[in-house]
């Protein structure tokens, strides 16, 4: 027996389940005792044969589904017969194709060894011209395409439900929310703007005896606008006791994501200066258009009283205090008492909390940055009621309110999406209401999506593969050589307690039904936001519940909605969530594809999320999801060396294409890519060894895996969006997400004869773990 095979069998001796469970040697298993201490891990061990399909996967219910798949062959044959190439000429057609491919392989030998991603996706990139059919998302890939499809499905379910239940209270409420966001509502918006202006005028009136806490509490009571507050309040899980909610205070988010644009730097190149001037010019155009929208501000339709420069100046002031120098700690987690906030930071927490609506004042608060908090409070107390800041308060409201009127949102799109992000077109009117519907009717949308799309076979398969890969990752960490014993022990403990959620959360709250209006979207959102805010206030210090979250800056679903096409590792709960919407082709395909394909798609996603347990951020949290420093000093230093090498690799690969970017921004994603790709390669490698395939089959199957990995990463980005994506996207460009991890795999380099000096060569073959 070859040494390689012996080593494999030693690593996976525990997988010989029959011998283990049917003998009296169970007590003698020492290194693998973990399999019997935890029922979840025990189940993993029982199923972890490292094969695609097992008896456990195809239970009685699933056998029926699988048999139904067989009947679809007839339908596919009908399509096959109608294919544009006559049946009697198809062999010759394929012969010609193969000859051409062989010629291309010789011609493109340099491309294979220098840019594997482009070699595999060359044909696709030539055929797909994204400018011909512009999309509202700048990255055209499987994730966005399928998410768009899901949005249209949800809208169809909504319309079908309304049609079927015309007179029900829920159907009427859903219909009103949807219609309000697809129809023009300028008159209603003008009324809301007047109310906002009246509130701000009253706040600035010395006779009303109001102060900065009236403004801050009002803004923070509305989550749609609170992200723009100079001091943002949120109720979130306590990072050091994640089973309980606690109040958090964080600092401002500015309008423009690239904060350097606000700063005049003498060392800027001419190109940089032109770009900064271009952005500032269009930002001012946007602001003038925004203030000109509403009659209470611009009654004569010609001039308004607000100066865009005021907003620029205020945001520059906020940027300055966010980076102010102080001897105080800049840790992201700072637990302070209400008394400390008031005495040391001059922030009247008691008054602020009372005006937020708290009946019992929270005693402790988590602050993201103490230095920035102190400087921000000093600034806003001095200037909050100046004319410049009054303009800023109005802007915070109007920026978000305008996005809920079907006509007005085009102005927001023209600057924030088109100029800043390079988006060619806005989100279609028909699916734009999804964010509002998700806020108001998340449970309804979840139930509808599950009813129409749940595929138990895919759920079972994904759970099975999750457990297999989790077990394999456990063994990989177990044999790690650079972690100190105490760090390794904590890492293994974290994997043992990792929770896997596939499909949708087990418990979700009922949707409240309000008297929504069909022509007033802002009113509708305020109804739900006010209700939700009161719910949050009642949760201070209490156990967590499932609350669907929305990123209101980007109108993006960020919670555990089952209709999100993505997967997540959540460090504060030490869990991986794979929504139901992700369990569909091309991400998983058990009808027509084999192990290599599914490993490269759903398998790679799972392995990637598993690796986030220990990335630059996930490594700060322990097995319970609590913020906890469980690393030794030596391990931290060693890990930083590895991170530095990863950053260097991604920047080096990009420079070859003339692209310069800061790879540190997305290093956590890069670490997860490198570790995840290595994990699924090891999974397939072990399957091939255990199945005793001959070497030529092993090589062929591994090649298929690498090809599919490149295919799953295929993506095109609109030219105008590349610059912004390099600055704000935590994920590097897909080309480097494929090529960089592959270049670290010894098997990949051996199979494709990659040598030092080739573009696909990297001197470091570490998979991090």
Q: Where in the sequence are the language-model features?
A:
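Extracellular/luminal recognition modules and glycoprotein regions
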Residues: 83-143
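Short, solvent-exposed loop/turn elements at domain surfaces
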Residues: 124-129, 255-258, 586
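Hydrophobic/aromatic-rich, well-ordered segments within soluble, folded domains that form packed cores
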Residues: 105-126, 267-291, 677-679
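Active-site rim elements
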Residues: 100-105, 261-276, 459-460, 650-668
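Arg/Lys-rich, intrinsically disordered low-complexity tails that mediate electrostatic binding
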Residues: 1-16, 20-42, 49, 78-79
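Extracellular mucin-like PTS segments
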Residues: 46-54, 59, 65, 71
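Intrinsically disordered, low-complexity linker/terminal regions across diverse proteins
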Residues: 92, 317, 321, 332-361, ...
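Noncatalytic, helix-rich "gating/capping" subdomain that lines the substrate-entry/channel surface
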Residues: 149-469, 505, 523-524, 532
């Amino acid at each position: 027996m070859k040494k390689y095979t012996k080593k494999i069998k030693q690593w996976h001796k525990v997988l010989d389940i029959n011998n283990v469970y049917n003998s009296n040697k169970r007590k003698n298993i020492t290194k693998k005792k973990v399999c019997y201490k935890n029922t979840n891990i025990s189940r993993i061990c029982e199923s972890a044969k490292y094969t695609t399909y097992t008896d456990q996967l195809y239970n009685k219910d699933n056998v029926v589904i699988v048999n139904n798949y067989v009947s679809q062959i007839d339908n596919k044959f009908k399509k096959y017969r109608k294919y544009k190439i006559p049946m009697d000429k198809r062999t010759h057609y394929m012969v010609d194709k193969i000859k051409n491919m062989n010629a291309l392989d010789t011609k493109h030998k340099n491309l294979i060894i220098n840019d594997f991603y482009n070699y595999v996706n060359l044909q696709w990139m030539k055929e797909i011209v994204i400018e011909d059919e512009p999309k509202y998302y700048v990255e055209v890939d499987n994730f966005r395409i399928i998410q768009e499809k899901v949005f249209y499905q949800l809208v169809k379910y909504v319309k079908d439900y309304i049609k079927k239940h015309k007179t029900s209270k829920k159907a009427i409420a859903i219909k009103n929310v949807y219609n309000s966001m697809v129809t023009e509502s300028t008159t209603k918006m003008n009324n809301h703007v007047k109310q906002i202006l009246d509130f701000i005028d009253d706040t600035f009136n010395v006779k009303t005896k109001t102060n900065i806490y009236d403004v801050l509490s009002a803004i923070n009571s509305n989550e749609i606008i609170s992200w723009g507050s100079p001091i943002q309040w949120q109720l979130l899980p306590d990072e050091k006791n994640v089973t309980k909610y606690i109040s958090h205070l964080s600092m401002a988010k500015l309008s423009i994501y690239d904060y350097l644009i606000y700063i005049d730097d003498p060392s800027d190149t001419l190109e940089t200066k032109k770009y900064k001037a271009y952005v500032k010019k269009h930002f001012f155009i946007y602001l003038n258009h925004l203030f000109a929208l509403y009659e209470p501000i611009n009654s004569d339709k010609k001039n308004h009283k607000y100066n865009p420069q005021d907003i620029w100046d205020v945001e520059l002031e906020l940027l300055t205090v966010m980076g102010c120098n102080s001897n105080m700690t800049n840790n992201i987690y700072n637990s302070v008492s209400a008394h400390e906030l008031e005495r040391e930071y001059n922030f009247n927490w008691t008054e602020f909390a009372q005006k937020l609506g708290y009946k019992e004042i929270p005693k402790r608060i988590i602050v993201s940055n103490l230095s920035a908090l102190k400087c921000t409070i000093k600034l806003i107390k001095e200037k909050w009621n100046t004319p410049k800041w009054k303009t800023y308060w109005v802007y915070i409201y109007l920026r978000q309110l305008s996005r809920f009127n079907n006509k007005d949102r085009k102005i927001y799109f023209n600057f924030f999406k088109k100029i800043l992000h390079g988006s060619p077109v806005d989100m279609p009117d028909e699916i734009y209401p999804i964010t509002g519907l998700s806020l108001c009717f998340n449970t309804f949308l979840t139930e509808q999506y599950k009813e129409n799309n749940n595929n138990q076979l895919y759920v079972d398969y994904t759970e099975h593969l999750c457990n297999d890969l989790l077990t394999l990752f456990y063994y990989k960490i177990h044999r790690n050589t650079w972690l100190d014993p105490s760090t390794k022990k904590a890492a293994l403990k974290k994997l043992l307690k990792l929770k896997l959620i596939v499909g949708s959360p087990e418990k979700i709250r009922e949707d409240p039904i309000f008297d929504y209006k069909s022509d007033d979207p802002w009113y509708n959102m305020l109804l739900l936001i006010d209700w939700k805010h009161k719910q949050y206030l009642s949760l201070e210090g209490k156990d967590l519940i499932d609350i669907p979250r929305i990123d209101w800056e980007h109108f993006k679903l960020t919670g555990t909605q089952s209709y999100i096409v993505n997967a997540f590792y959540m460090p504060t709960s030490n869990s991986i969530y794979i929504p139901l919407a992700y369990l569909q082709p091309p991400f998983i395909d058990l009808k027509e594809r084999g192990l290599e394909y599914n490993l490269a798609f759903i398998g790679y996603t799972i392995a990637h999320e598993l690796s986030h347990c220990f990335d630059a951020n996930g490594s700060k949290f322990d097995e319970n999801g609590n913020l906890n420093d469980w690393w030794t000093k030596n391990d931290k230093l060693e890990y930083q060396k590895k991170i530095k090498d990863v950053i260097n690799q991604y920047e080096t690969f990009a420079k070859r294409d003339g692209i310069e970017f800061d790879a540190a921004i997305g290093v956590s994603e890069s670490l997860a890519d490198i570790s995840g790709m290595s994990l699924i390669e090891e999974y397939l490698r072990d399957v091939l060894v255990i199945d005793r395939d001959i070497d030529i089959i092993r090589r062929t199957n591994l090649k298929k895996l690498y090809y599919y990995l490149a295919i799953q990463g295929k993506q095109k980005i609109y030219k105008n969006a590349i610059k912004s994506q390099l600055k704000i996207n935590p994920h590097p460009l897909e080309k480097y997400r494929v090529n960089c991890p592959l270049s670290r795999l010894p098997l990949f380099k051996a199979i494709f004869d990659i040598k030092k000096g080739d573009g696909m060569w990297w001197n470091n073959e570490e998979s991090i773990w």
